[in-house]
C-alpha cells in the first residue's frame, strides 16, 4: 500500500502537507528497484529522464531559500575554492558568519544527499547555514564530490573521493581560521543524512591521522550509516521506509561503491565501526527524527559510542521525517530549535 503522509498523524501537520505535495510533484508511484551495477546507475542518472528529475529537484531545493526565516542581513557570506588532497581536485566552501570582527566558534557542515546528490549551495542549505550562523557561529559548508550527480563541482566519484574532500576542507578551515575570524580550538563538525555519515567518517580519519585535537566535537543528524536496508535490528528501517526517503534498495551502496559495503568498511559505512574505531571520538550528539527509516541506526550508533566510553548524547525530534530541520520554510520553529541545540552543543563541548 502506498504511503499517504496525510494519514500519518505522527507527523507535524505542516510536514504532512509538504510531503504530500512533494509526492505529487514527483509524479511517479513506481517502486524503486535494485540496480545491477554502478555504470547502469550513472547512465540512468544522466539519461534525459534522470536529468529532468535532477533539474526538478534542484529547482525545488533552490526555491527553499528563505530570507524571512533566515535573513542575510547581519551576515557575511563568502565562497572559497580550495585544493583537495590527495587528488588535487578543486572543491568549494560556503562560509557564512555574523558580520562582526569577533572571533567565533565554527560549525564545519557537511550536506546530505546520501553522498550521492545535492549541494550546499542550494537554497535550502544556504537558509539552514544562515539559521545556524544567526546563533553566533561561523559556518563553513563543504561541497564535496558526490558519487552520482554533481554538486557545485563537476566531478562525480565513488568512495573515498567525497570523504577526502571533507577531510581536506576541514583541515583548510583549521589552517585558515584566523583569516575568517574563527577560533581554531572551537571547530565542531556537523552534518545530516549522508553528511551525518561523512561527519562521522571525517572524525575517524582525523583521529587516525593525528588531527583529532583539531576537532571540538561532533553533531550527527539522522546519520545514513548502515548501507543495507531493511534490517531486523533497526525496525524503523522497515516501518518508516517511504516517508520522504526510500532506503529499501541498493542504490546508495552501489553508487558509493558496493565493495565497501561488502567489506564492512567503517569509513564508508560507520555502522561497521568498532569500539576501537570510536574510543577516541570527541563529544558527540546524535540527533534523530521520529518518522525516519534511519532513526534506529542513529540510536544504535549513539549506544555504541557510549560503549566506547565517548561522551555522547542522543535527541529525538518528534513529529518529523528524515532531515526535517532542512525544511526551514515549512517548520522554522523546529529548524531553529535544532540550530540552537547545535550552538548549545558547541558551548558544552568547549567547557
Predicted regions span which residues?
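Alpha/beta-hydrolase superfamily serine-hydrolase fold, recognizing
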Residues: 1-48, 65-351
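Predominantly extracellular/secreted and cell-surface proteins with exposed
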Residues: 60-61
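A detector of tandem-repeat and repeat-rich interaction/domain scaffolds
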Residues: 53, 64-65
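Alpha-helix boundary/N-cap detector
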Residues: 48-55
Amino acid at each position: 500500500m502506498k504511503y499517504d503522509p496525510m494519514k500519518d498523524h505522527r507527523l507535524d501537520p505542516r510536514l504532512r502537507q509538504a510531503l504530500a505535495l512533494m509526492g505529487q510533484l514527483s509524479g511517479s508511484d513506481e517502486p524503486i528497484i535494485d540496480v545491477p551495477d554502478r555504470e547502469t546507475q550513472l547512465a540512468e542518472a544522466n539519461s534525459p529522464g534522470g536529468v529532468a528529475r535532477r533539474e526538478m529537484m534542484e529547482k525545488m531545493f533552490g526555491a527553499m531559500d528563505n530570507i524571512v526565516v533566515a535573513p542575510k542581513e547581519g551576515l557575511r557570506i563568502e565562497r572559497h575554492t580550495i585544493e583537495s588532497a590527495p587528488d588535487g581536485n578543486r572543491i568549494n566552501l560556503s562560509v557564512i558568519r555574523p558580520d562582526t570582527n569577533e572571533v567565533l566558534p565554527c560549525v564545519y557542515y557537511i550536506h546530505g544527499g546520501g553522498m550521492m546528490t545535492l549541494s550546499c549551495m542550494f537554497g535550502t542549505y544556504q537558509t539552514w547555514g544562515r539559521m545556524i550562523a544567526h546563533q553566533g557561529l561561523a559556518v563553513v559548508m563543504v561541497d564535496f564530490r558526490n558519487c552520482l550527480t554533481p554538486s557545485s563541482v563537476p566531478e562525480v566519484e565513488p568512495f573515498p573521493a567525497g570523504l577526502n574532500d571533507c577531510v581536506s576542507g576541514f583541515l583548510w578551515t583549521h589552517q585558515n581560521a584566523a583569516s575568517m575570524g574563527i577560533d581554531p580550538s572551537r571547530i565542531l563538525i556537523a552534518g545530516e543524512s549522508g553528511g551525518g555519515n561523512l561527519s562521522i567518517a571525517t572524525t575517524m580519519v582525523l583521529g587516525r591521522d593525528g588531527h583529532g585535537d583539531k576537532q571540538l566535537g561532533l553533531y550527527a543528524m539522522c546519520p545514513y550509516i548502515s548501507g543495507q536496508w531493511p534490517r531486523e535490528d533497526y525496525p524503523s528501517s522497515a516501518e518508516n521506509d517511504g516517508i520522504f526517503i526510500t532506503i529499501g534498495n541498493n542504490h546508495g551502496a552501489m553508487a558509493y561503491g558496493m565493495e565497501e559495503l561488502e567489506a564492512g568498511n567503517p569509513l564508508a559505512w560507520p555502522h561497521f565501526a568498532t569500539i576501537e574505531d570510536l574510543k577516541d571520538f570527541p563529544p558527540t550528539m546524535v540527533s534523530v527524527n521520529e518518522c525516519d527509516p534511519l532513526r534506529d541506526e542513529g540510536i544504535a550508533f549513539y549506544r555504541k559510542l557510549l560503549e566506547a566510553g565517548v561522551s555522547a548524547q542522543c535527541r529525538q525530534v518528534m513529529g518529523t521525517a528524515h532531515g526535517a530541520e532542512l525544511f526551514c520554510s515549512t517548520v522554522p520553529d523546529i529548524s531553529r530549535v535544532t540550530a540552537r541545540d547545535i550552538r548549545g552543543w558547541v558551548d558544552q563541548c568547549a567547557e
